[in-house]
Every structure is written in structure tokens, then in C-alpha cells.
Curated annotation (Swiss-Prot):
Gene3D superfamilies: SUI1-like domain. Belongs to the SUI1 family. This is Protein translation factor SUI1 homolog. GO terms for biological process: regulation of translation. The keyword Transmembrane does not apply. Pfam families: SUI1 (PF01253). The keyword Membrane does not apply. Probably involved in translation. Residues 1-24 are annotated as: Disordered. The modification N-acetylserine is found at residue 2. InterPro entries: SUI1, SUI1_dom_sf, SUI1_euk.
Length: 113
């Protein structure tokens, strides 16, 4: 009888809160690079999800110098700090972040159009 008791499966609740030590699916932190259409041919590239210990102003300064565009760091209530760049800079930003060693290529998600 003791063997049967140890083999009885327990109930699994998929909607229960995951424990901190359980790193299940969906816990991977991605860097999201999006493009938003403004008026006419103008567009805006946003970078969200970088680690908080990075200096966003220094990253922005390097991005602006590298791509010859203007940009700013915006504080959003839900998303935290977001880097905004003028123009469609999705590919440029992703290659820059990988080459600088800030983000792995697998951790970048590019959105838009």
C-alpha cells in the first residue's frame, strides 16, 4: 500500500502564482525594439526592456552619435525608462546592442510594420 500512496499524482494549478525559484516559460526578459509611424514619412523607434543598472543617457548618447539622429529618454509609468530615437533605427539599434555586449541576440524582439 505504501507504494501506491507515493505514486498518486498531485493536482496542478496552471493559474497559481509561480514561485521565485521556478523559472517557467514566459519569465525571460526581452528587449523590445518598436517603430511607430508619426505624421507622413516620419517614424519613431523605441527601445524598452534594458537592464535598470545601465545608464540610459550614456546609451542614448552613443546611439545618437552612431546613427546621426535625435533622441530622448522617456519615463513611462508602466514600461519604465524608454529610449526614443527619430527615424526607423530598428536594425541599427539591434546590431549596436549586440556588438556593445549589452544584450544577447536571442533576447531582442523587433516589432513594427
Amino acid at each position: 500500500m505504501s507504494e501506491l500512496d507515493s505514486q498518486v499524482p498531485t493536482a496542478f494549478d496552471p493559474f497559481a502564482d509561480a514561485n521565485a525559484e521556478d523559472s517557467g516559460a514566459g519569465t525571460k526578459e526581452y528587449v523590445h525594439i518598436r517603430v511607430q509611424q508619426r505624421n507622413g514619412r516620419k517614424s519613431l523607434t523605441t527601445v524598452q526592456g534594458l537592464k535598470k543598472e545601465y545608464s540610459y543617457t550614456k546609451i542614448l548618447k552613443d546611439l545618437k552619435k552612431e546613427f546621426c539622429c535625435n533622441g530622448t529618454v522617456v519615463q513611462d509609468s508602466e514600461l519604465g525608462q524608454v529610449i526614443q530615437l527619430q527615424g526607423d533605427q530598428r536594425k541599427n539599434v539591434s546590431t549596436f546592442l549586440v556588438q556593445a555586449g549589452l544584450v544577447k541576440k536571442d533576447d531582442i524582439q523587433i516589432h513594427g510594420f
